């Protein structure tokens, strides 16, 4: 503190009636160091109700999971509701970690096995959800591009698409 003095020992508290008690060892309170575990009062509260998801500022829910074998985060997609995102996390967690995975819905695995019919394809259901999610994202992107007056190939003829500016034309 660059030549300054520490004066905290000379400022009296409300419990000390007179400044004359300053500096006396008996009047000082001995502080017990507080450990980090005592400050928390148990478990840390989650921001979200579910594991592996977060809410975007515009309201959609994003899901991702960390793949420990690759050391990277795996993007699972964006969803309308927190439940959908949490279920996507559960499916990925079971694929990555197997039976030891911590799930948002522990009974989901039993329900999924009961719902799967012999000959039914669960990949079709997942791909339909992905198509729906991607189409919503595409519509949002098109709205963004229209707002900034960026040309969008939207049911245009091939000549109109050819007239759009491209990187190759600028060189």
From Swiss-Prot:
Keywords: Activator, DNA-binding, Ethylene signaling pathway, Nucleus, Oxidation, Plant defense, Stress response, Transcription, Transcription regulation
BP GO annotations: cellular response to hypoxia; defense response; ethylene-activated signaling pathway; positive regulation of DNA-templated transcription; regulation of root development; response to anoxia; response to water deprivation
Region Disordered: start-end pairs: 16-48
Listed InterPro entries: AP2/ERF_dom, AP2/ERF_dom_sf, DNA-bd_dom_sf, ERF_plant
Location in the cell: Nucleus
Maturation and modification: In presence of oxygen, the N-terminal cysteine residue (Cys-2) of ERF71 can be oxidized by cysteine oxidases, thus preparing the protein for N-end rule pathway-mediated proteasomal degradation. Under low oxygen levels, Cys oxidation is prevented, ERF71 is stabilized and confers tolerance to hypoxia.
Alphabetized Gene3D superfamilies for the sequence: AP2/ERF domain (3.30.730.10)
DNA-binding region, residue range(s): 49-106
Cysteine sulfinic acid (-SO2H) sites (modified residues): 2
Gene Ontology CC annotations of this record: nucleus
Any GO molecular function: sequence-specific double-stranded DNA binding
CDD domains on file: AP2 (cd00018)
Record's note on what induces expression: Induced under hypoxic conditions in roots. Induced during hypoxia under nitrate nutrition. Induced by osmotic stress. Induced by infection with the fungal pathogen Fusarium graminearum.
Biased composition (Basic and acidic residues): 37-48
Main location: nucleus
Family affiliation: Belongs to the AP2/ERF transcription factor family. ERF subfamily.
Role noted for this protein: Transcriptional activator that binds specifically to the cis-acting element GCC box 5'-AGCCGCC-3', or to the CRT/DRE element 5'-[AG]CCGAC-3'. Plays an important role in root development via root cell expansion regulation. Transcriptional activator involved in the hypoxic stress response. Plays a role in low oxygen signaling and contributes to tolerance to anoxia stress by enhancing anaerobic gene expression and ethanolic fermentation. Plays a role in the regulation of hypoxia-induced root slanting.
The protein's name in its UniProt record: Ethylene-responsive transcription factor ERF071
Name of encoding gene: ERF071
